[in-house]
Amino acid sequence: MLVKGNEILLKAHKEGYGVGAFNFVNFEMLNAIFEAGNEENSPLFIQASEGAIKYMGIDMAVGMVKIMCERYPHIPVALHLDHGTTFESCEKAVKAGFTSVMIDASHHAFEENLELTSKVVKMAHNAGVSVEAELGRLMGIEDNISVDEKDAVLVNPKEAERFVKESQVDYLAPAIGTSHGAFKFKGEPKLDFERLQEVKRLTNIPLVLHGASAIPDDVRKSYLDAGGDLKGSKGVPFEFLQESIKGGINKVNTDTDLRIAFIAEVRKVANEDKSQFDLRKFFSPAQLALKNVVKERMKLLGSANKI
């Protein structure tokens, strides 16, 4: 059943666990995520970026999620707009049936971010929809939005306190050192957990970790064995994800891991049987690989058996 994002995250906030927020761009990804949620008895945060919506069509994206909710009526599901860049894109998502939206104005100055976020919150709350915002700037590329290392900024906890109080945003993504994509760290992985804990103490709302894909060893190996190139890639270590939850993270965004796992299996089939053109032969193992990544992440973050 479709529910407000806050219905899922406030429970996680109160009980101290994390919920994976999984991106999708087609039916195969969506089906695998729902199957994982069903098998692990976990609530679901389903995400679509502006780019994914452009690719699928917003009505198709919402329609597929609603059909899957009918198939699995016992699973609480939030449908979330990931990295909405304008008021208009958030409003369009709300009108289309999304139950949670993110307004990402982190590239603006603090006051402009606060003003735009407050405007989105008012609109969305009037429609019964939850809102996420971001403070600080993450390095990396997300849906063709690029932030260089020199422009990445960690969150200021005091600003976060004021931002949450004045905007009335439901959950906040503080920049604590992660980055988008498969190349998250140049040296040893490092996240500012003390900063995270201070943000949690001052805001006392659900917090979100962006750029949280781990690139697990088995997923990396499958991709490399199939001829893929991930030279220099580094994900967020599993122990960092667990430590971030202890520090107050309740929503953990995961996209890159899903893409890598899925494409690895597609490459494998293509390499092993060059005469194969039955799409089901490609997508069935790809869905299984993606489902297994999601299931393991649910157990790691603590959302398994939380329905």
Curated annotation (Swiss-Prot):
Q: Which GO terms describe its molecular function?
A: fructose-bisphosphate aldolase activity; zinc ion binding
Residues annotated as binding Zn(2+) 2: D104, E134
**Binding positions (Zn(2+) 1):** H83, H180, H210
Q: Which reaction does it catalyse?
A: beta-D-fructose 1,6-bisphosphate = D-glyceraldehyde 3-phosphate + dihydroxyacetone phosphate
InterPro entries cross-referenced by the UniProt entry: Aldolase_TIM, Class_II_FBP_aldolase, FBA_II, Fruc_bis_ald_class-2
| Note on how the cofactor is bound | Binds 2 Zn(2+) ions per subunit. One is catalytic and the other provides a structural contribution.
GO biological process terms held by the UniProt record = fructose 1,6-bisphosphate metabolic process; glycolytic process
Its annotated pathway? Carbohydrate degradation; glycolysis; D-glyceraldehyde 3-phosphate and glycerone phosphate from D-glucose: step 4/4
Give EC number(s), comma-separated: 4.1.2.13
Assembly notes? Homodimer.
- Record-given protein name: Fructose-bisphosphate aldolase
Name the gene for this chain: fba
